Curated annotation (Swiss-Prot):
Entry binding sites for Mg(2+): 392
Name used for this protein in its record: Phenylalanine--tRNA ligase alpha subunit
Entries under InterPro entries matching the protein: aa-tRNA-synth_II, aa-tRNA-synth_II/BPL/LPL, Phe-tRNA-synth_IIc_asu, Phe_tRNA_ligase_alpha_bac/arc, Phenylalanyl-tRNA_Synthase, WH-like_DNA-bd_sf, WH_DNA-bd_sf
Lineage summary: Archaea, Thermoproteota, Thermoprotei, Sulfolobales, Sulfolobaceae
Provenance organism: Saccharolobus solfataricus (strain ATCC 35092 / DSM 1617 / JCM 11322 / P2)
Domain of life of the source: Archaea
Family that this chain belongs to: Belongs to the class-II aminoacyl-tRNA synthetase family. Phe-tRNA synthetase alpha subunit type 2 subfamily.
CC cofactor note: Binds 2 magnesium ions per tetramer.
Quaternary structure and interacting proteins, as annotated: Tetramer of two alpha and two beta subunits.
Gene that this polypeptide is encoded by: pheS
Length: 468
């Protein structure tokens, strides 16, 4: 039975017809394919009786990591001469330019007679220079033995052994033994196709799987949430991760001895901030001392921290004394010390929103929240009374999810008059904060919060976001 030749096998035999004998390295270059592929093809041809092979070991030189670096940047002595450009310079000036290459450059330049050093100055003997070692780094095959020895001495190349398979043609193929996989118009019209064997196709084989780029599912979820807020007429705002305790706590009517300020509940950052608005600072101080009955300290309020709630961004909005009506939101990371497990992370996302409007009511706030959750795909929502330091009245919102039942979604309420009066806002304001990771876990059917940040490529490809 005649064994059909593949197109690449036929190509190798075609090259050998002229060369008679060659090796795997040359064939790989001629065919433009990896040597490993050529070796596999040669072995198939040997088994079919078309070629004979012989394996030889050959020593050759390759660039070390330092050699690759010098090939890109140049050798230190070359850089030194080109830096001098025919002019003498102070040793210290050269040292500052060459840094860690200074000693190597001076040593080799003196050894090669390229410079003199007198009275703390480097005096070049040539204006330009390019060493033979540098030129050899780009073409080791043509380098002479002296240059090779220098490169080895300098640790720029290393000797390695490789196996080369020499190939010799012993039988030429017949046209009927050559298979083709692409039947084109020319072959059909000319009738040439009759001389070849057509490669068999497995019609039951699955087509190749092509992966297309897509957003990370959690990033896609975050963007969908932003789109919903913008579609409801809210404007997005963002502030930095590092915040003063003033905006994270004090302006939100949270006393300076509150447990949330303890080291186990927030991350401290070295240094302190500055608040230009002294009237605002004094207003907050007076309100704290009047209602909380303690001595408010400015050095505490100016301390820096990683924000523990995006309500700090809401606080900055309030501090800018915006005029009603205003509808803004922020979606960003917050940071809290915690033991990382399936339900806790030390950094996570919060969605905070605030509406400032004349005569804005608590009932309207609940309506806005229901609409947000409805657009997120949560059709059933209920509210329970709650307590938060900066809102009154306050509620917790719960949404019904098929697999989990009633799940807490957010905390919300009307901002306390103590907060609004400190920033000089006469209108009513409603605010809320939503834990985004909890929502995302529900929508993506994820039981481990760490999977929201997975870098497992297969898992990322297979996970989809769908919000009805």
């Amino acid at each position: 039975m005649i064994s059909m030749l593949s197109e690449n096998e036929a190509k190798i035999l075609f090259f050998l017809k002229d060369l008679k004998k060659t090796n795997s390295v040359e064939l790989a270059i001629k065919m433009g394919i990896p040597e490993s592929s050529v070796l596999s093809l040669i072995e198939l041809l040997r088994e079919k009786g078309y070629v004979k092979t012989e394996v030889k070991s050959e020593k050759h030189y390759v660039l070390t990591e330092e050699g690759r670096k010098r090939k890109e940047s140049g050798l230190p002595e070359d850089i030194l001469i080109n830096t001098l450009n025919g002019q003498e310079k102070d040793l210290n000036e050269i040292k500052n330019i060459l840094n860690k290459d200074f000693n190597i450059a001076i040593s080799w330049a003196k050894r090669k007679g390229l410079i003199d050093i007198k009275e703390g100055k480097v005096i070049p003997k040539v204006k330009t220079y390019m060493s033979s070692e540098y030129l050899a780094l780009s073409n080791l095959e043509r380098a002479d033995s002296n240059t090779i020895n220098l490169l080895k001495k300098r640790g720029l190349i290393e000797e390695k052994e490789r196996k080369i398979v020499s190939v010799e043609l012993i039988k030429e193929p017949k046209e009927s033994e050559i298979g083709i996989s692409n039947l084109n118009r020319e072959l059909i019209i000319s009738g040439e196709w009759k001389k070849y064997k057509l490669k068999k196709y497995n019609v039951e084989a699955f087509p190749p799987y092509y992966t297309i780029s897509k957003k990370h599912y959690f990033r896609e979820f975050l963007e969908k949430v932003k789109d919903i807020m913008i579609s409801l007429g809210f404007k997005e705002i963002n502030t930095g991760y590092i915040e003063m305790e003033f905006y994270n706590f004090d302006l939100l009517f949270q006393p300076q001895d509150h447990p949330a300020r303890e080291i186990h509940d927030s991350f401290s950052v070295e240094g302190s901030g500055k608040i230009e608005d002294k009237d605002l600072l004094n207003n907050v101080k007076e309100i704290h001392e009047k209602f909380w009955k303690y001595e408010w300290k400015q050095d505490i309020t100016l301390r820096l921290m990683l924000r523990s709630q995006t309500t700090a961004t809401t606080a900055r909005v309030l501090a800018s004394r915006p005029k009603a009506p205003q509808k803004v939101f922020t979606l960003g990371k917050v940071f809290r010390p915690d033991a990382i497990d399936a339900t806790h992370l030390i950094e996570f996302h919060q969605l905070d929103g605030v509406i400032i409007d004349n005569n804005f009511t608590f009932k309207e706030l609940l309506g806005v929240l229901k609409e947000i959750f409805y657009r997120l795909g949560i059709k059933e929502v209920k509210f329970k009374p709650a307590y938060f330091p900066f809102t009154e009245p306050s509620v917790e919102a719960y949404g019904y999810l098929e697999k989990l039942g009633w799940v807490e979604m957010c905390g919300a309420g009307l901002l306390r008059p103590e907060i609004l009066s400190s920033v000089g806002i006469d209108s009513t304001a409603g605010a809320w904060g939503i834990g985004i990771e909890r929502l995302a876990m529900s929508f993506l059917n994820i039981s481990d919060i760490r999977l929201l940040y997975s870098n497992n490529i297969e898992y990322i490809r297979d996970t989809k976001v769908k919000i009805e």
